[in-house]
Protein backbone atom coordinates (compact mmCIF):
# COMPACT_ATOMS: atom_id res chain seq x y z
CA UNK A 1 0.00 0.00 0.00
CA UNK A 2 1.32 3.42 -1.00
CA UNK A 3 0.95 6.17 1.58
CA UNK A 4 -0.30 9.55 0.42
CA UNK A 5 2.65 11.97 0.69
CA UNK A 6 0.66 14.59 2.64
CA UNK A 7 1.78 17.66 0.76
CA UNK A 8 1.73 20.97 2.57
CA UNK A 9 -1.45 22.61 1.22
CA UNK A 10 0.33 25.99 1.28
CA UNK A 11 2.76 26.48 -1.59
CA UNK A 12 4.16 29.86 -0.54
CA UNK A 13 3.57 31.83 2.64
CA UNK A 14 4.59 35.48 2.97
CA UNK A 15 3.56 36.90 6.32
CA UNK A 16 -0.23 36.59 6.65
CA UNK A 17 -0.59 35.84 2.93
CA UNK A 18 -0.59 32.24 1.71
CA UNK A 19 -0.77 30.79 -1.79
CA UNK A 20 -2.39 27.37 -1.66
CA UNK A 21 -1.92 24.54 -4.13
CA UNK A 22 -5.69 24.29 -4.56
CA UNK A 23 -5.96 27.95 -5.56
CA UNK A 24 -3.03 27.44 -7.93
CA UNK A 25 -4.87 24.54 -9.58
CA UNK A 26 -7.77 26.88 -10.39
CA UNK A 27 -5.39 29.52 -11.74
CA UNK A 28 -3.71 26.90 -13.93
CA UNK A 29 -7.12 25.83 -15.19
CA UNK A 30 -7.95 29.38 -16.27
CA UNK A 31 -4.53 29.73 -17.94
CA UNK A 32 -5.09 26.49 -19.89
CA UNK A 33 -8.56 27.70 -20.88
CA UNK A 34 -7.07 30.89 -22.31
CA UNK A 35 -4.23 29.06 -24.08
CA UNK A 36 -6.55 26.56 -25.74
CA UNK A 37 -9.05 29.30 -26.56
CA UNK A 38 -6.41 31.24 -28.47
CA UNK A 39 -5.38 28.07 -30.30
CA UNK A 40 -8.96 27.66 -31.48
CA UNK A 41 -9.16 31.29 -32.55
CA UNK A 42 -6.02 30.81 -34.66
CA UNK A 43 -7.56 27.67 -36.19
CA UNK A 44 -10.74 29.55 -37.13
CA UNK A 45 -12.83 27.28 -34.88
CA UNK A 46 -14.07 29.84 -32.37
CA UNK A 47 -16.75 32.49 -32.03
CA UNK A 48 -14.32 34.45 -29.83
CA UNK A 49 -11.82 37.11 -30.74
CA UNK A 50 -8.76 37.46 -28.50
CA UNK A 51 -10.41 40.42 -26.79
CA UNK A 52 -13.79 38.75 -26.28
CA UNK A 53 -12.07 35.59 -24.98
CA UNK A 54 -10.36 37.63 -22.27
CA UNK A 55 -13.68 39.31 -21.49
CA UNK A 56 -15.48 35.97 -21.25
CA UNK A 57 -12.82 34.61 -18.90
CA UNK A 58 -13.97 37.08 -16.25
CA UNK A 59 -17.56 35.91 -16.65
CA UNK A 60 -16.44 32.29 -16.55
CA UNK A 61 -14.38 32.73 -13.39
CA UNK A 62 -17.38 34.27 -11.61
CA UNK A 63 -19.61 31.45 -12.84
CA UNK A 64 -17.19 28.76 -11.63
CA UNK A 65 -16.61 30.26 -8.19
CA UNK A 66 -20.14 31.43 -7.39
CA UNK A 67 -21.86 28.44 -8.97
CA UNK A 68 -19.38 25.95 -7.53
CA UNK A 69 -19.78 27.29 -4.02
CA UNK A 70 -23.57 27.63 -4.12
CA UNK A 71 -23.85 24.18 -5.69
CA UNK A 72 -21.86 22.67 -2.84
CA UNK A 73 -24.03 24.46 -0.29
CA UNK A 74 -27.31 23.36 -1.91
CA UNK A 75 -26.42 19.85 -3.09
CA UNK A 76 -24.22 18.60 -0.28
CA UNK A 77 -24.44 20.47 3.06
CA UNK A 78 -27.56 22.61 2.92
CA UNK A 79 -28.69 21.92 6.50
CA UNK A 80 -25.24 22.74 7.92
CA UNK A 81 -25.01 26.04 6.07
CA UNK A 82 -28.62 26.86 6.93
CA UNK A 83 -27.62 26.65 10.59
CA UNK A 84 -24.38 28.61 10.02
CA UNK A 85 -25.00 30.84 6.96
CA UNK A 86 -21.82 32.91 7.39
CA UNK A 87 -19.78 29.74 6.76
CA UNK A 88 -20.90 29.96 3.13
CA UNK A 89 -18.31 32.69 2.62
CA UNK A 90 -15.43 30.63 4.05
CA UNK A 91 -14.32 29.42 0.62
CA UNK A 92 -10.75 28.92 1.85
CA UNK A 93 -12.00 25.99 3.96
CA UNK A 94 -12.93 24.12 0.78
CA UNK A 95 -16.26 23.02 -0.61
CA UNK A 96 -16.86 23.41 -4.35
CA UNK A 97 -19.22 21.44 -6.57
CA UNK A 98 -18.52 20.76 -10.25
CA UNK A 99 -22.23 20.51 -11.04
CA UNK A 100 -22.86 23.88 -9.39
CA UNK A 101 -19.87 25.39 -11.18
CA UNK A 102 -21.16 23.98 -14.46
CA UNK A 103 -24.55 25.62 -13.97
CA UNK A 104 -22.78 28.87 -13.06
CA UNK A 105 -20.78 28.79 -16.29
CA UNK A 106 -23.90 27.97 -18.33
CA UNK A 107 -25.57 31.08 -16.90
CA UNK A 108 -22.42 33.10 -17.64
CA UNK A 109 -22.45 31.82 -21.24
CA UNK A 110 -26.11 32.78 -21.65
CA UNK A 111 -25.56 36.29 -20.27
CA UNK A 112 -22.36 36.81 -22.28
CA UNK A 113 -24.05 35.59 -25.46
CA UNK A 114 -26.97 37.99 -25.00
CA UNK A 115 -24.59 40.89 -24.43
CA UNK A 116 -22.47 40.14 -27.50
CA UNK A 117 -25.14 38.75 -29.82
CA UNK A 118 -23.66 35.22 -29.94
CA UNK A 119 -25.95 32.19 -30.08
CA UNK A 120 -26.08 30.20 -26.84
CA UNK A 121 -25.34 26.81 -28.41
CA UNK A 122 -22.54 28.19 -30.60
CA UNK A 123 -20.92 29.66 -27.52
CA UNK A 124 -21.38 26.40 -25.60
CA UNK A 125 -19.72 24.51 -28.46
CA UNK A 126 -16.76 26.89 -28.37
CA UNK A 127 -16.29 26.75 -24.60
CA UNK A 128 -16.75 22.98 -24.11
CA UNK A 129 -13.36 21.79 -25.49
CA UNK A 130 -11.51 24.37 -23.37
CA UNK A 131 -12.82 23.08 -20.03
CA UNK A 132 -11.58 19.50 -19.36
CA UNK A 133 -7.91 20.32 -18.76
CA UNK A 134 -9.05 22.79 -16.12
CA UNK A 135 -11.01 19.97 -14.49
CA UNK A 136 -7.87 17.83 -14.59
CA UNK A 137 -5.95 20.59 -12.84
CA UNK A 138 -8.60 20.79 -10.14
CA UNK A 139 -8.40 17.06 -9.45
CA UNK A 140 -4.64 17.33 -8.98
CA UNK A 141 -5.42 20.05 -6.45
CA UNK A 142 -7.76 17.62 -4.66
CA UNK A 143 -5.02 14.98 -4.61
CA UNK A 144 -2.40 17.36 -3.23
CA UNK A 145 -4.85 18.36 -0.50
CA UNK A 146 -5.44 14.69 0.30
CA UNK A 147 -9.22 15.18 0.04
CA UNK A 148 -12.03 13.40 -1.80
CA UNK A 149 -10.27 10.06 -1.40
CA UNK A 150 -11.71 6.80 -2.68
CA UNK A 151 -13.48 3.82 -1.21
CA UNK A 152 -11.69 0.99 0.57
CA UNK A 153 -9.99 -1.45 -1.81
CA UNK A 154 -7.89 -4.61 -1.51
CA UNK A 155 -4.73 -4.26 0.55
CA UNK A 156 -2.66 -6.03 -2.15
CA UNK A 157 -3.92 -3.94 -5.08
CA UNK A 158 -1.11 -2.01 -6.75
CA UNK A 159 -3.27 1.12 -6.78
CA UNK A 160 -4.10 0.93 -3.05
CA UNK A 161 -3.24 4.13 -1.20
CA UNK A 162 -3.51 5.04 2.45
CA UNK A 163 -4.74 8.53 3.28
CA UNK A 164 -3.68 9.70 6.77
CA UNK A 165 -6.36 12.39 6.53
CA UNK A 166 -9.01 9.63 6.36
CA UNK A 167 -8.22 8.06 9.74
CA UNK A 168 -11.61 8.97 11.22
CA UNK A 169 -13.45 7.44 8.25
CA UNK A 170 -11.10 4.45 8.37
CA UNK A 171 -11.98 3.76 12.00
CA UNK A 172 -15.68 4.14 11.28
CA UNK A 173 -15.50 1.73 8.32
CA UNK A 174 -13.38 -0.82 10.20
CA UNK A 175 -15.94 -0.97 13.00
CA UNK A 176 -18.30 -2.78 10.62
CA UNK A 177 -15.80 -5.07 8.86
CA UNK A 178 -13.50 -7.49 10.72
CA UNK A 179 -11.01 -7.73 7.83
CA UNK A 180 -10.74 -3.96 7.57
CA UNK A 181 -10.32 -3.78 11.34
CA UNK A 182 -7.38 -6.18 11.02
CA UNK A 183 -5.82 -4.05 8.26
CA UNK A 184 -6.33 -0.90 10.29
CA UNK A 185 -4.66 -2.44 13.32
CA UNK A 186 -1.72 -3.67 11.25
CA UNK A 187 -1.13 -0.67 8.96
CA UNK A 188 -2.71 2.22 10.84
CA UNK A 189 -4.94 3.13 7.89
CA UNK A 190 -7.10 1.45 5.26
CA UNK A 191 -6.15 0.99 1.58
CA UNK A 192 -8.26 3.22 -0.62
CA UNK A 193 -8.67 4.06 -4.28
CA UNK A 194 -6.85 7.28 -5.23
CA UNK A 195 -10.09 8.39 -6.87
CA UNK A 196 -8.82 11.93 -7.43
CA UNK A 197 -6.35 10.48 -9.96
CA UNK A 198 -9.08 8.41 -11.61
CA UNK A 199 -11.13 11.57 -12.05
CA UNK A 200 -8.05 13.42 -13.32
CA UNK A 201 -7.64 10.74 -16.00
CA UNK A 202 -11.32 10.31 -16.92
CA UNK A 203 -12.98 13.72 -16.53
CA UNK A 204 -9.80 15.58 -17.41
CA UNK A 205 -7.48 13.87 -19.87
CA UNK A 206 -9.86 11.41 -21.57
CA UNK A 207 -12.71 13.90 -21.85
CA UNK A 208 -10.34 16.52 -23.24
CA UNK A 209 -9.01 14.12 -25.89
CA UNK A 210 -12.50 13.09 -26.99
CA UNK A 211 -14.06 16.57 -27.13
CA UNK A 212 -10.97 18.34 -28.52
CA UNK A 213 -10.48 15.85 -31.36
CA UNK A 214 -14.19 15.72 -32.19
CA UNK A 215 -14.40 19.51 -32.37
CA UNK A 216 -11.42 19.88 -34.74
CA UNK A 217 -13.97 19.75 -37.57
CA UNK A 218 -17.06 21.88 -37.96
CA UNK A 219 -19.96 20.04 -36.33
CA UNK A 220 -23.70 20.67 -36.18
CA UNK A 221 -24.47 23.41 -33.69
CA UNK A 222 -24.96 21.97 -30.21
CA UNK A 223 -23.26 18.63 -30.85
CA UNK A 224 -19.88 19.45 -29.29
CA UNK A 225 -21.55 20.80 -26.14
CA UNK A 226 -23.73 17.68 -25.99
CA UNK A 227 -20.66 15.45 -26.28
CA UNK A 228 -19.03 17.28 -23.38
CA UNK A 229 -22.22 17.11 -21.31
CA UNK A 230 -22.79 13.40 -21.84
CA UNK A 231 -19.09 12.52 -21.73
CA UNK A 232 -18.54 14.24 -18.40
CA UNK A 233 -21.65 12.65 -16.95
CA UNK A 234 -20.55 9.16 -18.00
CA UNK A 235 -16.96 9.54 -16.77
CA UNK A 236 -18.09 11.05 -13.47
CA UNK A 237 -20.70 8.33 -12.98
CA UNK A 238 -18.02 5.65 -13.45
CA UNK A 239 -15.44 7.36 -11.22
CA UNK A 240 -17.96 7.73 -8.40
CA UNK A 241 -17.97 3.94 -7.91
CA UNK A 242 -14.40 4.29 -6.63
CA UNK A 243 -14.89 7.56 -4.74
CA UNK A 244 -15.87 7.61 -1.08
CA UNK A 245 -19.40 9.04 -0.73
CA UNK A 246 -19.69 12.17 1.36
CA UNK A 247 -19.99 11.07 4.99
CA UNK A 248 -22.91 13.42 5.66
CA UNK A 249 -24.90 12.05 2.71
CA UNK A 250 -23.71 8.49 2.16
CA UNK A 251 -25.29 6.52 -0.66
CA UNK A 252 -28.74 7.55 -1.84
CA UNK A 253 -31.50 5.76 -3.78
CA UNK A 254 -30.37 2.61 -5.65
CA UNK A 255 -27.04 2.77 -3.85
CA UNK A 256 -25.86 5.72 -5.95
CA UNK A 257 -23.99 8.76 -4.67
CA UNK A 258 -25.08 12.37 -4.98
CA UNK A 259 -22.44 12.88 -7.68
CA UNK A 260 -23.93 10.03 -9.70
CA UNK A 261 -27.50 11.29 -9.39
CA UNK A 262 -26.40 14.77 -10.47
CA UNK A 263 -24.64 13.20 -13.46
CA UNK A 264 -27.68 11.25 -14.69
CA UNK A 265 -29.44 14.31 -16.22
CA UNK A 266 -26.15 15.27 -17.89
CA UNK A 267 -25.87 11.83 -19.49
CA UNK A 268 -29.48 11.83 -20.70
CA UNK A 269 -29.40 15.40 -22.06
CA UNK A 270 -25.98 14.82 -23.61
CA UNK A 271 -27.02 11.69 -25.50
CA UNK A 272 -30.36 13.15 -26.62
CA UNK A 273 -28.70 16.40 -27.72
CA UNK A 274 -25.86 14.65 -29.55
CA UNK A 275 -28.27 12.49 -31.56
CA UNK A 276 -30.81 15.25 -32.18
CA UNK A 277 -28.30 17.87 -33.32
CA UNK A 278 -26.53 15.25 -35.44
CA UNK A 279 -29.80 14.37 -37.20
CA UNK A 280 -30.35 18.02 -38.16
CA UNK A 281 -27.23 17.82 -40.33
CA UNK A 282 -28.79 14.97 -42.30
CA UNK A 283 -31.77 17.15 -43.21
UniProtKB/Swiss-Prot annotation:
Could you tell me which pathway this protein works in?
Protein modification; lipoprotein biosynthesis (diacylglyceryl transfer)
Positions binding a 1,2-diacyl-sn-glycero-3-phospho-(1'-sn-glycerol) in this chain are 139
Q: Which residues cross the membrane?
A: 17-37, 56-76, 92-112, 117-137, 194-214, 222-242, 255-275
Report membrane topology: Multi-pass membrane protein
- The organism's place on the tree of life at top rank: Bacteria
Q: What is its EC number?
A: 2.5.1.145
List where in the cell it is found: Cell inner membrane
GO MF annotations for this entry? phosphatidylglycerol-prolipoprotein diacylglyceryl transferase activity
Role of this protein: Catalyzes the transfer of the diacylglyceryl group from phosphatidylglycerol to the sulfhydryl group of the N-terminal cysteine of a prolipoprotein, the first step in the formation of mature lipoproteins.
What's the protein called, per UniProt? Phosphatidylglycerol--prolipoprotein diacylglyceryl transferase
Species for this entry: Neisseria meningitidis serogroup C / serotype 2a (strain ATCC 700532 / DSM 15464 / FAM18)
Amino acid sequence: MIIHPQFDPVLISIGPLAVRWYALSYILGFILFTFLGRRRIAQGLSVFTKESLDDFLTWGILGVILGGRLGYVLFYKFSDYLAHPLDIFKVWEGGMSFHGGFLGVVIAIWLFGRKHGIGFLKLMDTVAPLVPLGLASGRIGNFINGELWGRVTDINAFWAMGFPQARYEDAEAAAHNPLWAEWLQQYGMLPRHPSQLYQFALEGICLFAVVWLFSKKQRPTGQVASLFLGGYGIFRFIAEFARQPDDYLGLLTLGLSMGQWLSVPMIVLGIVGFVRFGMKKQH
